[in-house]
A protein has these predicted regions:
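Surface-exposed loop/turn positions within WD40 beta-propeller blades
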Residues: 32, 69-71, 100, 110-112, ...
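Repeat-based scaffolding regions
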Residues: 109, 132-134, 155-162, 174, ...
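Non-cytosolic head/periplasmic domains of membrane-anchored proteins
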Residues: 51-153
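Beta-strand-rich domains and repeat architectures in extracellular enzymes and scaffolds
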Residues: 5-33, 49-57
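Structural motif
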Residues: 72-75, 112-116, 158-168, 210-215
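Single conserved hydrophobic/aromatic residue that forms the stacking wall/gate
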Residues: 230-241
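Short loop/turn segments that connect beta-strands within beta-propeller blades
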Residues: 40-41, 78-80, 119-122, 171, ...
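A short beta-strand motif characteristic of beta-propeller blades
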Residues: 2-11, 43-49, 81-87, 124-131, ...
Length: 242
């Protein structure tokens, strides 16, 4: 680009601690003091004040969640305002929101971790206690609009690092399964730090040696694994369904 045109300007006193994220054409603005949504002309659509030490956010379409990392408060919102608030019992590690407003949260109290699932109004759908040895420490979480939550766990067995990808179903399909886990895959000598929900029936796990994809709206199954060029052999995988 050789030139640009300024469309709008807005004064911001605390530019260091304020973050901006696109929110379906508008802008989500959040800081330790509060959250707001502004339009392209920088007109405030709504705002909410709070006190957080280290706010983090996740946006999916017209829905967003803002949480206090290592704190206990989170705000669920859409383009019209806050739809729900939650005060957790343990420290917040990570939050993810689906485009319908369902929220998944990883919590940690040093001894154990929890993965909680919330409605857009902040009411609790489910809470899952996880342990370091089984199924491991939750590294990341993704959530779809149809009530399926994807989690990647990591645990160490002797000198071997193992990752476990689990799919939880909070609809009718998962109600008779232990911990609502409808499918799961174990990957030996592999680290999976990130998972994503691409659609209601497509998921991806980003591995340190490539990536794996999964398909299925209710019971996702592994469909493909692509390894990077430096890994010529695929790790041993075992299907694990609780």
């Amino acid at each position: 680009y050789h030139s640009y045109k300024v469309l709008n300007t807005s004064e911001q006193e605390d530019v260091v601690s304020t973050q901006y994220v696109d929110m379906d054409g508008d802008i989500l603005r959040y800081s330790p003091d509060g959250v707001s949504v502004v339009d392209n002309s920088m007109n405030t659509i709504w705002n909410e004040t709070y006190t957080m030490q280290n706010p983090i956010a996740d946006v999916n379409g017209s829905r967003a969640v803002v949480a206090d990392s290592e704190g206990t408060s989170l705000y669920i919102c859409d383009k019209k305002g806050v739809t729900g608030t939650v005060t957790t019992s343990y420290a917040i590690v990570k939050v993810r929101i689906a485009s319908n407003g369902m929220v998944a949260v990883i919590l940690d109290n040093d001894d154990n971790t929890w993965i909680n699932f919330y409605n857009p109004d902040g009411s609790l759908v489910a809470e899952n206690l996880t342990k370091i040895d089984d199924p491991g420490y939750p590294m990341d979480v993704a959530v779809s609009d149809n009530g399926v939550m994807m989690v990647t766990f990591q645990y160490v067995d002797g000198s071997k690092t193992t990752s476990y990808v689990a799919f939880y179903n909070y609809g009718d399909v998962g109600q008779n399964e232990d911990d609502r886990i409808v499918s799961g895959y174990t990957y030996e000598n592999v680290v999976i730090p990130q998972v994503e929900c691409i659609s209601d029936s497509k998921y991806i796990a980003l591995r340190d040696d490539g990536f794996s994809t999964y398909q299925g709206s209710q019971i996702p199954k592994e469909s493909k694994t692509v390894l990077s060029l430096i890994h010529i052999s695929e790790p041993t995988r075992h299907l694990r369904i609780s």
